[in-house]
Amino acid sequence: MSELSFDAPVWHHGKALRKGYTTGSCATAAAKVAALMVLRQHLIHQVSIVTPSGVTLCLNVESPHIEGQQAIAAIRKDGGDDVDATHGMLIFARVTLNDSGEITLTGGEGIGTVTRKGVGLPLGSAAINRTPRHTIESAVREAIGPARGADVEIFAPEGEARAQKTYNSRLGILGGISIIGTTGIVTPMSEESWKRSLSLELEIKRASGLTRVILVPGNHGERFVREQMGVDTQAVVTMSNFVGYMIEEAVRLGFCQIVLVGHPGKLIKIAAGIFHTHSHIADARMETLVAHLALLGAPLELLTLVGDCDTTEAAMEHIEAYGFGHIYNHLARRICLRVMQMLRFTKTPPVCDAILFSFDNHILGSNRPVDEIAKELQC
């Protein structure tokens, strides 16, 4: 994408909606400019970064300050017309140079701390997600060169207060906000517009001659397909939370095979017949796990532990500890059954497969051997 693609508005019902950028982009830009200020020993008032999606952002720097081998800078979060709890707040970075050759990244005031398992980050660590961690470290490394080291602290003075308006506490992230964003860009869009844009991608794939499609909730699914299945991601289409809608669109377009690939946190809902997986529609993850564990003969102790979990990842640890990992194959088959039930009035329903994977990109389960599915997708 180019810089113009960020400036171009998103149109919805004849209204131009402005894009924004994530807390991850703010932290990356703040860290980069702070590192540059330490090296150059003069204040910088504008900085550019390239987001993970390839969009170039040129951002204004606020509160720049240099003191010896340390500098501080801030970037103001702008969510565009998709305003959330972090919109308008300052995300700061403090960079201190050293001779270690290593870059360390920590969270300071206003950045949440991970207190529960299940969010993909170590207990006790700052709530700075994987993609922003990578972009922050890469931006600082680019600025300071290969030999120097740096201590990078991300902080947000308003973070603790703003976090009260988020779901962080329910996820066990306490004391502040999370630094997030897999693309770096916030795209405002209504649900119907978003669904239509996803459907358009399906139409383009079908028009190119593809007859088999892999539907994933988001970026992690696409990476799994590429790295673990060895399948061309040309066949991958994001379905977001709109599982039922995208399956129906794939059927309408004449795809002969649909493969659902994702983390259990999303796909497990399909096993319960939930085809819109956003949490504001329905959850039932733990209830679904408990029900199917019970069907497999799991002890009451495990059922109780899983039922008390707040995240799927936390439940998965208990499942592994009790030796019930075979539930994922069972759930994958159940997911396919639910899809076929939904399509029971379809004249020629497609083949349906389901693959569940962990945050570490390991295969957890599938309705049939993954190698067999991958081979068919490569035909």
From Swiss-Prot:
Extract one GO BP annotation from the record: methylation
Q: Which reaction does it catalyse?
A: Co-precorrin-5B + S-adenosyl-L-methionine = Co-precorrin-6A + S-adenosyl-L-homocysteine
Instruction: Give, as in the UniProt entry, the pathway in which the protein acts.
Output: Cofactor biosynthesis; adenosylcobalamin biosynthesis; cob(II)yrinate a,c-diamide from sirohydrochlorin (anaerobic route): step 6/10
Enumerate the SUPFAM superfamilies for this protein.
Answer: CbiD-like
Q: What is its EC number?
A: 2.1.1.195
> Which GO molecular function annotations are given, in alphabetical order?
cobalt-precorrin-5B C1-methyltransferase activity
InterPro entries for the chain: CbiD (IPR002748), CbiD_sf (IPR036074)
- Matching Pfam families: CbiD
Its domain of life reads Bacteria
Top EC class for this record? transferase
Q: Does the keyword rRNA-binding apply?
A: no
Q: Which UniProt keywords apply?
A: Cobalamin biosynthesis, Methyltransferase, S-adenosyl-L-methionine, Transferase
What is stated as this protein's family in its record?
Belongs to the CbiD family.
HAMAP family tied to this protein: CbiD
Q: What is this protein called?
A: Cobalt-precorrin-5B C(1)-methyltransferase
Organism, by scientific name, is: Salmonella paratyphi C (strain RKS4594)
Biological classification of the source: Bacteria, Pseudomonadati, Pseudomonadota, Gammaproteobacteria, Enterobacterales
Gene, per the UniProt record = cbiD
